[in-house]
Amino acid sequence: MEIHSSVVPAITNVKSLDEIRRSAKFHPTVWGDYFLAYNSDNTEITAAEHEEHAKQKEMVKKLLTLAPNDPTDKMQLIDAIQRLGLQYHFEKEIQEILQSIHANFKADKDLHTVALRFRLLRQHGYNVACDVFNNFLNKEGDFMESITNDFEGLLSLYEAAYLGTHGEEILDKAIEFCSFHLQSSLPQISNVSLSKRVEEALYIPTHKSLTRFGARKFIPIYEEDESHKKVLLNLAKLDFNIVQKIHQKELSDLTRWWTKLEVPKNMPYSRDRLVELFFWIVGVYFEPQFTTARRILVKAISMASLIDDTYEHATLDELKVLTDVIERWDTNAVIKDWPPYTQMCYKYLFDTYAEIEDEVEERESYRVQYAKKEMQKLVRAYFDEAKWLYKNYLPTWEEYMKVSTVTGAYMMLSTTSLVGMGDLVTKQDFDWVVREPLIVRASSVISRLMDDLVGDEDEQKPSGALCYMKQYGVSKEEACAEVRKHVKNAWKDMNQECLEPRPASMQVLTRVVNLGRVINLLYTGDDWYGNPLGSKEWVKMVFVEPLTI
């Protein structure tokens, strides 16, 4: 593509503009160059580790293929494999077992068995009916009090209910019923492993949790379970440590890339969050084969974060010119008399996307063009929000959602997440994702509104709740309840889109759903991205501390 050099007119009266310039005070990075210490020597996976890993995998594969005919035993084994973060090794075997269970469906009176089967089948795309839970209702249509003492069954029903779609009122009832009784029964649960599983589920249910982070928390809980399978536990620990070394090496390389940019020096108003962003993207795909995809997506989300902070810091005149430069993707633009940070902003962006182009094969270069267009769309939306702020304009709820679901960056990330996935995706997948299908819109709604719910009270930017309050004349509590309802409905949209017949492959859909899962963790109770102290322990668990074998 031919690029023409251009000169952009200078912005005048910079001193007076500085007086109205907005700025935010973000907590400095808590990691600095810590991960630079992880080099090829201390992240090397030894031959002994490879050999033991292969041996343990074969043993677990035999467990799956030679599992007894009892469907409940098979399902519990599959559930443990998934929660230990090992599913990616046994996808074929798991799919064959679930096909058989689905084809040979038998009614069951055991709540745990019914709920576990429902959850596993729905997780794998089977559109099984929720009326399997009717047997546990009384004549009034409420759940029977007799099941409240079945803690394992109650937990299984609670977990299964989060796979619900629109119109499945019995699952909405199940969440309310189970959460109340599990919470009130916690002191009575003597089984330590079960008690901890209940606590974790009440905080974030399995369906909404991250595979990698969830596995790190589940492994010690599984170890405390007297019925655990030793070979499965051993593989889970070894696999976790091996993948951790891969992530440490990637994070070391990315830290080196980030350090060379000198962001804190050149853009001191911005968030320095490379490590937290890597945690974010590992939530999208943690598996070893996605190293390139992770590197690309971390770089893209890092640029989005810098641009977001710049659009909240710069003046409207500066942003108008910056938006124009990015809209034209003018890599040779020369902007006279601009503050240095504005020029660094688009230089970082263009250089980073040039690096991304180098990451993919020539036959896949079209993918980067899709990614660029989504970034341009994101920048236009940032500019729309900036105009609202400078004009003191409070948008309607509809106007707000149209723009803010873009500035949440999940439309851009959904597209860019596919760029480095190799042969697992096609051009048709990119054509599909940029049309903003329902699952992408739903993930974007979750991203924006979860952020809004924990946003600072004194933020200058309008929030969904504020727009709803002013437009409909309701209280803050009522507006927040409406926002939560939209988040709940968005999860149901995503659940529906993952059932057969699917609009895209599960490899593609999983990236979009995982983005929703990341935001659910980061914005449950607080903004753990804006406040890195809160997520520091999570980072240590996943990237620093190996498991004891």
Swiss-Prot record:
Necessary cofactors: Mg(2+)
Cofactor binding, per record: Binds 3 Mg(2+) ions per subunit.
Domain of life the protein comes from: Eukaryota
EC number(s) given by UniProt: 4.2.3.75, 4.2.3.100
UniProtKB keywords: Lyase, Magnesium, Metal-binding
Pathway of action: Secondary metabolite biosynthesis; terpenoid biosynthesis
Pfam families assigned: Terpene_synth, Terpene_synth_C
GO molecular function: germacrene-D synthase activity; magnesium ion binding
UniProt: (2E,6E)-farnesyl diphosphate binding residues: 271, 308, 312, 448, 451
Residue ranges of coiled coil: none
Top EC class of this enzyme: lyase
InterPro entries named in the record: Isoprenoid_synthase_dom_sf, Terpene_cyclase-like_1_C, Terpene_cyclase_plant_C1, Terpene_synth_N, Terpene_synth_N_sf, Terpene_synthase-like, Terpene_synthase_metal-bd, Terpenoid_cyclase/PrenylTrfase
Family: Belongs to the terpene synthase family.
Known function: Sesquiterpene synthase that catalyzes the formation of sesquiterpenes and sesquiterpenoid alcohols. Converts farnesyl diphosphate (FPP) to germacrene D. Converts FPP to bicyclogermacrene. Germacrene D is the major product.
Name assigned to this protein: Germacrene D synthase
